[in-house]
């Protein structure tokens, strides 16, 4: 892939008039795309689920719930709702990023191998539009939790078309490697972030992120 084939974009703000949703049969859940101001009840329920999932592994501080709860930095969010009406997973999307300094990835990699590569990958793509997936989780006790995680992962690239950007990125805690940056371009399935060394974190089986995008 060469970025010369891509066109720089102007950042745009998205405003939904209503929630978007689709039934995902293999996961037996309804996947909803919304915005914090449009559906504050669903937004708060999603956040509380994220808090429970992260607290289970003692990493709730990484959510920074006080800072994100007003939704001001969140362009849109995804919520998976099971047949009983419970929110069993979700993720939120921020951006477009103006530079690597807008991404929490540079904080996560501070003092670790791969920081310069993370910065370069974000900065090289920022002119073409990059959004970041944050606060992803799935209730590991839910029926079909693996299918729910897969449904969320399949849906996350939708943020590129909704927000008019070329790339989606994120960091995720893997069971062995720790967080690794991943990118998906609208014209390519390349995942250049796979070569970046991770940073060790506790095993986090129900924290889901862009490692499932490929």
Q: How does the language model describe each region?
A:
Residues 1-61, 69, 136-140, 161-214:
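Terminal substrate-recognition subdomain of acyl/acetyltransferases
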Residues 64-69, 77, 119-123:
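Catalytic micro-motifs at enzyme active sites that drive phosphoryl/nucleotidyl and oxygen chemistry
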Residues 68-79, 86, 98-102:
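A short helix-loop-beta-strand connector motif used in the catalytic cores of GNAT acetyltransferases and
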Residues 74-78, 129, 200-208:
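Short beta-strand micro-motifs in enzyme catalytic cores
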Residues 85-89, 182:
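Glycine-rich acetyl-CoA-binding "A-motif" of GNAT/NAT acetyltransferases
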Residues 92-139:
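Conserved acyl-donor/pantetheine-binding loop and adjacent beta-alpha core of acyl/acetyltransferases
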Residues 115, 133, 157-160, 168:
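Aromatic (often tryptophan-rich) hydrophobic motifs at membrane interfaces
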Residues 144-160:
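Conserved acetyl-CoA-binding loop-helix of GNAT-fold acetyltransferases
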């Amino acid at each position: 892939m060469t970025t010369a084939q891509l066109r720089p974009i102007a950042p745009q703000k998205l405003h939904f008039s209503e929630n978007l949703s689709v039934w995902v049969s293999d996961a037996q859940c309804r996947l909803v795309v919304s915005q914090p101001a449009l559906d504050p009840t669903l937004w708060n329920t999603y956040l509380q689920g994220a808090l429970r999932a992260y607290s289970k592994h003692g990493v709730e501080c990484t959510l920074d719930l006080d800072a994100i709860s007003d939704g001001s930095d969140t362009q849109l969010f995804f919520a998976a709702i099971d047949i009983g009406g419970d929110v069993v997973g979700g993720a939120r999307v921020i951006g477009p990023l103006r530079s690597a300094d807008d991404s929490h990835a540079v904080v996560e990699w501070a003092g670790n191998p791969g920081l310069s590569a993370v910065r370069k990958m974000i900065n090289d793509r920022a002119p073409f539009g990059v959004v970041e997936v944050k606060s992803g989780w799935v209730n590991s006790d839910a029926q079909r939790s693996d299918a729910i995680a897969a449904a969320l992962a399949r849906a996350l690239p939708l943020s590129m078309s909704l927000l008019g950007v070329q790339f989606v990125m994120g960091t995720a805690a893997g069971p062995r490697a720790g967080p690794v940056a991943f990118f998906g371009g609208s014209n390519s399935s390349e995942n250049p972030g796979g070569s970046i060394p991770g940073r060790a974190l506790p095993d986090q089986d129900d924290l889901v992120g862009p490692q499932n995008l490929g």
